[in-house]
Amino acid sequence: MVKPRASRTREQVTANSDAGGYWTGTHTLHRLRFHLVWTPKYRRRVLEGAVAARLTALLHEACEIKDWQIHELSVQPDHVHLLLQVSPTDSIFSVMQVLKGGTSGRLRTEFPHLEEFLWGKHFWGEGYFAETVGQKEEAVLRAYIRNQGKKSEGSGVPDSAKPKKVRP
């Protein structure tokens, strides 16, 4: 099991979260929030019911241990959306290693019936999506994550997240 870092205390995180979400370190003031999305291998629709509930608990547990703050989380049958605040010492690669690697083995062990859908040694697909989130777009992104899986008019994708058309 990974030990919590001693670089900042829970009180510092909580106190600074109320002041615009900024965290402090020894010589730093930072607000690093990322929108992360990843999928099960083959984009199988296996994140439902007890599996989704357990994944949610495992993600909260991992983030508590690493001293990261979950701002929004949506587990859909075939993908996960997460709005996460981390420290400047955490690379996105290492964050995803903890989130995907730390949940993969436990989910496969606790739900052996998933072998039928996810053969091999991997639960998650290889890739992931990561983007930084500024204060201005955070409200739109939070609503987007909260409304995942709900029927709506239109695509449900914020205009800022839609691909831009480039004319030749």
Regions found by a protein language model. Give the residues of each.
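Basic nucleic-acid-binding interfaces
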Residues: 1-168
